[in-house]
């Protein structure tokens, strides 16, 4: 009947509206996360807030992460890095086909950018102590170098990080929020607003 058809049309329209508001096709891509005090932004290079980290961990990734048993597992890399016999050089292979939310594919240049940004004096990163054993980090922090001497890009998916001295916790440290990887283009474009904007 025409009444049952009209009711079906109303139900269909309500379902479509509900689908859009619940994240269906055509919905805005917004993450809402309740937090009493989120700290001073989501850029974990410039923040030490555990509250900010709890949010940042929902939208950014480091090369490794800790599982529920506090064991590390690869996230953005295919496996744990191989380490040279002298304990100085770590060789990484990125997973292929990983994309940032802006659609760009993760490559070695984004990882290099992230670590170099950390040691750039203008960033005023609070997390450098976790990584300042990387060769050339101290020179960048002092402003006498603009590139990280210990970071070598092999190709889009392979890179090496060389340390000044053996440092056993290095692999653990790259699994923290302080080593979340940023897309170079988007981060550069956002400038000082990185981690603050909507």
Task: Give the ranges of each region predicted by the language model.
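Residue-level signal for nonpolar/aromatic packing positions in well-ordered secondary structure
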Residues: 1, 5, 33, 63, ...
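Extracytoplasmic
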Residues: 26-30, 58, 75-77, 85-89, ...
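N-terminal lobe/hinge region of extracytoplasmic solute-binding protein
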Residues: 34-85
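Aromatic- and charge-enriched surface segment that lines or borders ligand/interaction sites
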Residues: 79-130, 160
């Amino acid at each position: 009947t025409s009444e049952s058809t009209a009711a079906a049309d109303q139900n269909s329209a309500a379902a479509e509206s509900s689908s859009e508001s619940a994240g269906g096709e055509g919905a805005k891509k917004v993450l809402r996360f309740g937090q009493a005090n989120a700290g001073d932004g989501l850029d974990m290079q410039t923040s030490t807030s555990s509250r900010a980290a709890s949010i940042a961990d929902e939208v950014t990734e480091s090369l490794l992460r800790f599982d529920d048993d506090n064991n590390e597992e690869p996230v953005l890399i295919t496996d744990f890095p191989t380490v040279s016999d002298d304990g100085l050089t770590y060789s990484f292979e990125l997973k292929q086909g990983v994309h940032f939310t802006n659609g760009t594919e993760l490559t070695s240049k984004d990882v290099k950018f992230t670590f170099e940004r950390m040691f750039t004096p203008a960033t005023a990163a609070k997390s450098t102590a976790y990584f300042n054993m990387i060769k050339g980090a101290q020179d960048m922090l002092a402003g006498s170098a603009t590139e990280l001497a210990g970071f070598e890009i092999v190709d889009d998916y392979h890179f090496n990080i060389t340390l000044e001295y053996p440092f056993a916790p290095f692999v653990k440290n790259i699994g923290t929020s302080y080593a979340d990887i940023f897309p170079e283009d988007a981060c550069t474009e956002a400038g000082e607003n990185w981690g603050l904007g909507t």
